Amino acid sequence: MTLKELVVGFGTQVRSLWMIGLHAFHKRETLMYPEEPVYLPPRYRGRIVLTRDPDGEERCVACNLCAVACPVGCISLQKAEQKDGRWYPEFFRINFSRCIFCGLCEEACPTTAIQLTPDFEMGEFKRQDLVYEKEDLLISGPGKYPEYNFYRMAGMAIDGKQKGEAENEAKPIDVKGLMP
């Protein structure tokens, strides 16, 4: 080892100690997580939930658009039909171990049944526990859109009345009849 190498090595050690001394008294960036809450942006996309409409029914009509829009294929569902003709998912399953929380399922949902909440604490010890069924995903409230009801907005038959036959509702316009 030459004298030059010894001086350079000593200089790097002094420089390292100087940097440690400078940063020893700065404010720390590490948060003590459970005690200090983490800042989440206003539109943070976290845990996925299934919501209900204002009448208390499931909003999901099992259209399968969320499963098609999902880039990793973590959503699976099966359509069933009630006696009144309304569709609902017989089973609805999300595998959160594969989900990338991109929000495409929420954007694709025409009934606003799927919504992403800011909840991010979903750690499990076993991978199988990250597969959520419909009962785990359903919440009791309407979520972000409390007044929205898909069947009323879509003009589906409600209580046996077709579109335009309910109270204070105009008859639908025949778009094809207006064409030249």
Swiss-Prot record:
The name under which this protein is listed is NADH-quinone oxidoreductase subunit I
Q: Where does [4Fe-4S] cluster 2 bind?
A: 70, 99, 102, 105
GO molecular-function term, one example from the UniProt record = 4 iron, 4 sulfur cluster binding
Cofactor or coenzyme needed: [4Fe-4S] cluster
InterPro entries referenced in this protein's UniProt entry, alphabetically: 4Fe4S_Fe-S-bd, 4Fe4S_Fe_S_CS, NADH_quinone_OxRdtase_chainI
Q: Where does [4Fe-4S] cluster 1 bind?
A: 60, 63, 66, 109
Q: Gene3D superfamilies given for it?
A: 3.30.70.3270
Enumerate the NCBIfam families for this protein: NuoI (TIGR01971), PRK05888.1-1 (NF004536)
Enzyme nomenclature, EC number? 7.1.1.-
Domain 4Fe-4S ferredoxin-type per the UniProt entry, residue ranges: 50-80, 90-119
Function field: NDH-1 shuttles electrons from NADH, via FMN and iron-sulfur (Fe-S) centers, to quinones in the respiratory chain. The immediate electron acceptor for the enzyme in this species is believed to be ubiquinone. Couples the redox reaction to proton translocation (for every two electrons transferred, four hydrogen ions are translocated across the cytoplasmic membrane), and thus conserves the redox energy in a proton gradient.
* Subunit: NDH-1 is composed of 13 different subunits. Subunits NuoA, H, J, K, L, M, N constitute the membrane sector of the complex.
What is the protein's membrane topology class?
Peripheral membrane protein
Q: Which family does it belong to?
A: Belongs to the complex I 23 kDa subunit family.
Keywords attached to this Swiss-Prot or TrEMBL record, sorted alphabetically, are: 4Fe-4S, Cell inner membrane, Cell membrane, Iron, Iron-sulfur, Membrane, Metal-binding, NAD, Quinone, Repeat, Translocase, Ubiquinone
List the PANTHER family. Answer: NADH DEHYDROGENASE [UBIQUINONE] IRON-SULFUR PROTEIN 8, MITOCHONDRIAL, NADH DEHYDROGENASE UBIQUINONE IRON-SULFUR PROTEIN 8, MITOCHONDRIAL
User: Which cellular components does GO assign to this protein?
Assistant: plasma membrane; respiratory chain complex I
